Regions:
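OB-fold nucleic-acid-binding modules
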Residues: 4-255
């Protein structure tokens, strides 16, 4: 069996290296991009989002991983001239298994530009073992600085498009209500927190978080607490919220 698996890996690597199609002539893949890979940056992708999404353009760029949330990975790049931080979502999906997308890792990503619910994301990434394909995720370095912007509720508005997918921190949030998702899906156990900061309402959405004993962290942990949170800015129902993907990103203060 290992003998045949090696043949399959080599065949797949060759097809990627030579840009051979994996579909027959009578089965056209509508999402297949036949053009050259565009070497760019996250800023370049965001600036050309509409056209790149339309053409399902394949891009290659460097970025630093900020947070992991199951199938979703968040990444950033800092403009060396302006210091501006640009962020993007990498859709890992169910099939991509790699240790290269850990927080603080600087990597080269190759994938297709797509859009989901109005937000740009990178799909169709690969990291095939033993393959030398340029399309593989490339680890450049580990332990890189992750830029986290401190924000207040006045900045957390959808017109501030530069915050989308950014890693932010908000301090001194007074929790006033909590709600746990219970709809029979994979998000069961996720908690939505409504809080007040600087006199304004803010919404915090957690992933399904697990404690050190592998128990799901329940909403009562947050009730009536004063907290600082670090998370990813996401749009939901026309408003921004902060998505927390690790309990270590929540700091609790004594009342």
């Amino acid at each position: 069996a290992p003998r045949y698996s090696d043949v399959l890996v080599q065949a797949q690597a060759q097809s990627l290296r030579l840009k051979l199609r994996l579909y027959g002539p009578d089965n056209v893949d509508e999402n297949w991009y036949g053009g050259e890979v565009i070497e760019t940056t996250i800023k370049g992708i965001l600036d050309n989002q509409e056209q790149y999404v339309k053409d399902t353009v394949k891009v290659r760029f460097d970025c630093t991983i900020t947070r992991n949330d199951g199938m979703y990975v968040y990444a950033q790049d800092v403009d060396g001239l302006t210091g501006e931080v640009y962020s993007i979502l990498l859709y890992k999906g169910y099939n991509l298994t790699t240790k290269k997308l850990e927080n603080g890792n600087k990597v080269t990503i190759c994938g297709n530009v797509a859009e989901y619910e109005g937000n740009v994301q990178i799909t169709s990434m690969q990291d095939i073992p033993l393959s030398t394909s340029a399309d593989n995720i490339k680890l450049i370095s580990k332990g890189n600085e992750i830029v986290c912007k401190e924000v207040n509720p006045s900045e957390l508005v959808v017109s501030n498009t530069g915050l989308s997918r950014c890693l932010v921190r908000m301090n001194n949030i007074k929790v006033i209500s909590t709600y746990t998702t219970k709809n029979g899906g994979s998000n069961d156990g996720a908690v939505t927190i409504t809080g007040i900061c600087d006199g304004k309402n803010v919404t915090i959405r957690t992933s399904v978080l697990i404690d050190d004993n592998y128990h799901t962290i329940t909403e009562d942990v947050y009730q009536n607490q004063n907290i600082d949170v670090t998370g990813i800015v996401e749009e939901y129902n026309g408003a921004y919220q902060i998505k927390v993907v690790a309990i270590s990103d929540v700091i609790f203060h004594n009342n």
